[in-house]
């Protein structure tokens, strides 16, 4: 649970203050065990230290919402799943321990006769309360704070070391203390993995696992009275289960990660050659645009030729209508001139058509050149404007020539009449 709202200084100070207060209170509260008159295997007064330390840190430091993020009491499907694991894993540890006792010793101790002068229900309630106050401080508060700056695995290591120091027992010698340290550290690592990704819903899981472990050990083993073989069996069994559970969890998460990534790549493949495909598509689009421009230019050339034909027909109609105005004049010589003019117009039309075709070819060549230089738009507009201008100029020249020919014919007719 990464949350960078808490500064690095406050994060470090919170962890330090919590640990110092917890250790100091655990030393001071030892004297109250005999005062309250409760046997230590029912309820350890020193276990109140983490709860008190957590409350003090919450009151002293700011960002209360972040500090209380691991103290949610709601239930989810994942919490129920982890609660089942919190009951199954202690059972597996106890089964391994009992099998080890039967294999390497005569038998395990069942319902010890020493120190069990109280009802079992009192012991069960006492262990549930001990588990709650300890895990409230270490898992629901401290691990939540540590996870704001590091992932769950490393946060579990940090909290596990602190919890092992808090639970250290040097009364029965160094070897006993070493195995007790291994047991409590493995115990804490399992708890850290159990509460992973529960979004602050940690207290039920941690309390269930803690109470199940301590309650079973009271009745099956005698490590609380300093038996070295018992603590050795418990420590090794817990370490084996911790390694197996955490390793299996990592493998499952790794497989899930790879499967999810593969599915995402199938949906949206990360193709590093996409830019090549984009270039090919761009070139294809440009080629299509170029061919379309060439076709438009050819159509423009054809329309120019048809325009010339229209101008020719208009000129012929004008020339044909003019002699009808002078029906009294002689028709031989004007008709001869009209035929010559018509032939001249046909020659001019042929020249104009040739020029139009040449103009279309030049436009086509110009468009192809412009497409290679990425300047097709401006040249296309210019090339489309030129045939239209040329059409207007040629039509005007043909009409002017026809008018001049008519005037000349009228003059010749008037001279002959005279």
From Swiss-Prot:
GO terms for cellular component: plasma membrane. GO terms for molecular function: endopeptidase activity. Disulfide bonds: none annotated. It is found in: Cell membrane; Secreted, Cell wall; Cell septum. It is a multi-pass membrane protein. One of its GO terms (biological process) is CAAX-box protein maturation. The keyword Membrane applies. Residues 282-299, 323-353, 379-418 have a biased composition (Basic and acidic residues). The keyword Cytoplasm does not apply. It holds the Pfam family Rce1-like. Residues 274-418 are annotated as: Disordered. Its main location: membrane. The chain crosses the membrane at residues 9-29, 41-61, 84-104, 118-138, 153-173, 175-195, 202-222, 231-251. InterPro entries: Rce1/LyrA-like_dom. Keywords: Cell membrane, Cell wall, Membrane, Secreted, Transmembrane, Transmembrane helix. Belongs to the LyrA family. C-terminal region not involved in glucosaminidase activity of the SagB-SpdC/LyrA complex. Interacts with N-acetylglucosaminidase SagB; interaction is direct and facilitates peptidoglycan processing. Interacts (via N-terminal region including transmembrane domains) with sensor protein kinase WalK (via N-terminal region including transmembrane domains). Interacts (via N-terminal region including transmembrane domains) with sensor protein kinase SaeS. Interacts with other histidine kinases, perhaps via their transmembrane domains. Involved in bacterial cell envelope homeostasis. Regulates peptidoglycan processing by N-acetylglucosaminidase SagB, perhaps acting as a scaffold protein. Pleiotropic regulator of gene expression, probably acting via interactions with multiple two-component systems. Plays a role in the abundant deposition of the immunoglobulin G-binding protein A (spa) at the cross-wall, a subcellular structure that initially arises from cytokinesis. This is Lysostaphin resistance protein A. It comes from Staphylococcus aureus (strain bovine RF122 / ET3-1).
